[in-house]
Amino acid sequence: LMEYSIHDAIRAGFTKVVFIVKPEILGLVRTLCGDSLRGKTTRGGKPLEVCYAFQDFESLPAFYTLPAGRTKPFGTTHAVLCARDYVNEPFCVINADDYYAVDAYRTIYEELGKLAPSGESTMVGYLLRNTVSAHGTVSRGVCHVEDGHLTGIHEALKIQLFPDGTIADVADGQRRELAADMPVSMNFWGFMPSIFDQMEEYLDDFLRALPPEEIKAECLLPNMVGDLLKKGRLSVSVLHSADRWFGMTYHQDRQAVARELARLHENGTYPPTLRS
């Protein structure tokens, strides 16, 4: 799915791709995707810039002592912060295993050109009903939107689609029904480079507050955005996509994803092969 995202981003006008990877999978990422980008050009005809940023424990602040037994990465805020040295322009953030659809990239690229250098960002929101899986629960950033801007966001960690079509968050053994047409975040964010200072500050505060023995907690991007919203330090415009998101949350999703991609090739959304 990452190849489709890169293809769509280049068509929209983006000129650089930064892969954020664990050092031990760099070779795999190069083989599966990075090497195929050699010779690719941007919409303006210039060579596509491709970079690799490592998310590892070495990039954590010096004051933090890693607890014994910690192997889990520190989450999406830390991941994006690891790309700081490679990003000096407005940028978008995506998940590698999600398909966001063509129009979303055009929309966010245009919006990034309108943002102030600091204090403003953007996101693409999707209807909840278009982002659930029939094969198990999913986690989503539930968005609260007023006048086209995000006013709050919280992570619903266990959203389930039931046979009768209802959707509910079933975390903690409770069942809290959710509106099928409510907007959710799929981690498709648009930021200005000034956000890195705020990310660094938030990650520092997150790490200082962790119990010394904590080995699983993650510093998540939606939580950082929500914190900045509460403090009045960030404004987030919400762009809407009626397109159907799809992704590889579960192995059983693979067949449906393959069918949908085949349909998109057949109807001309994509050429016969992305590597031509």
Name every feature range the model reports, one short phrase each.
Residues V102-W189:
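Conserved core of the sugar-phosphate nucleotidyltransferase
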